[in-house]
Amino acid sequence: MFEVPITLTNRKFAQRRKLKYQYINYISRRFDRISKKSTTTDSLPTPENSAAENNDEEEGQNSEAGTYRRSVLQQKKRRRERHWRSVVGEIYSTTESETDSQEEETEEGGEHDTGIDKEDSDEERKFWKKYEKPEKSFEIWRTVSSQNKQPINKQKMTYHNFKKIEKIPLRKMEIPLLHCTKENKLYFQSISRGLEPLKTSTSEVRNYRTRHIVTLTDLLHLNVSRHNWSLAYKIFATLIRIPGVQIKSLWGIGVEILDNLSNSSSGLDFLQWMCQIYSSKSRFVQNINYRSIVPPFQTGSRTHTAKFAITYLWSSLINCQKSMEPSSNIIDKPFDTENDLLQELIDKISEWVLTPPFMEDAEVWFIYASCHLLKADTLSRQFVNDNKNNDLIGLDRDIKINQVIKHIHYVRTFLKICLDKGGFAVPSRLIENQLKSFESRLYGEAQDIQERDVANVYDSIDNSSVENSFGDVYETNAEFLDTQLMDLSPEDNGLDEMHYSDEDSSE
């Protein structure tokens, strides 16, 4: 019922995968040859690479179209000659099969020119070399803005062209099918015609261990859907201890169980253990013929970040944000910048971005910038409550201000790196507004405190000393000055006019 977290490595399934990928490679190569497209592309047709080309590219396409039309005319001419020779009764050697074989020879000769690796005999590895990352096999639909809309690279094919493309790959597959079993022949015939076999790879297995794994997998998903977390945890703990089970296929449901199970360790510890055990630094030896290749989006590679590593970074950031939520108990405590969880996460990411694949992943750089954003928010929040605590004064205050400015600078720098890497959308305007609010906490709140201190000093003195400090009050707050002028008596107004006249004479 559900996907089984094992990889069957017996000879029958290895032969099935070889036949499937070999046929796909033949079809792709023949299609690229007929459609006059380069075989060096590493992605499927997407709206990005189907935009309007320049004039040079259009001229190149016109020249390629001209050569294609000439080749079609030559084929029609040869076909017409064969027809009239057969009508006359002349025996000729250029039969259809021989012409097809000549096309195959020219196609094989063209492989050396296009740079196809002939030494690599693994058809599955040939196929996945074109798709280093899973997202390259998806189409990108730009429908948010009318300016970013691009035409989809649609290609129509007639039934005649399809049969022409399919003829030579099927003929090439006759020799590999001679050494296959009858079951694998039926499997190949079904997938080549676009059919899907009803029997899965695990439904035919009669091994006791595999049958137990299939049963436990079904029970695990059923109990998770019913929110029976205690029983699901027992099944998960039993399943990951069976030899042959790939934990990399079960980590998602395992984290969900650990997060919802009471009186147990958090799923964050499990993700941290996954990052330590399944490191992306492990080297893949090309000379070894691996019978089963695990997809890179499960294990991670030097060009692709593992999904559980990204999930671990996001979960750690959310955990740090929850532990630093503003409350009366947290604000009154002194802030420790060396031993908190957020600083540990920043140090960990700073080590990760020095090595591939993290240094080329835009999402990792965005998480790195988000950590410094949270750090700047936490440090700048101390200035809001400075009037209550009176802790930040003198040199200590200047140090805290420099720390906030440093983290704000890191946020802008890492966001720029994230945008340069591409492939990740960033709310730049929202983040910039938050950074400006952090800066306003440093200076805007200090100015308000200074104004309040001046107002308190003026309230504490008597009216006889108003004219002595009148100029200082005027320079600080003009509105406060106007209200006091309205309350002064006529005698005080006369003294005030004498005060201004003395200032003008001194100037």
UniProtKB/Swiss-Prot annotation:
Biological process according to GO: nucleolar large rRNA transcription by RNA polymerase I
The keyword Transcription is annotated on this UniProt entry: yes
Stored Pfam families: Rrn11
Principal location: nucleus
Compartment list: Nucleus, Nucleolus
Residue spans of biased composition, Basic and acidic residues class: 109-124
Record's signal peptide: none
GO cellular component terms given for this protein: nucleolus; nucleus; RNA polymerase I core factor complex
Protein name: RNA polymerase I-specific transcription initiation factor RRN11
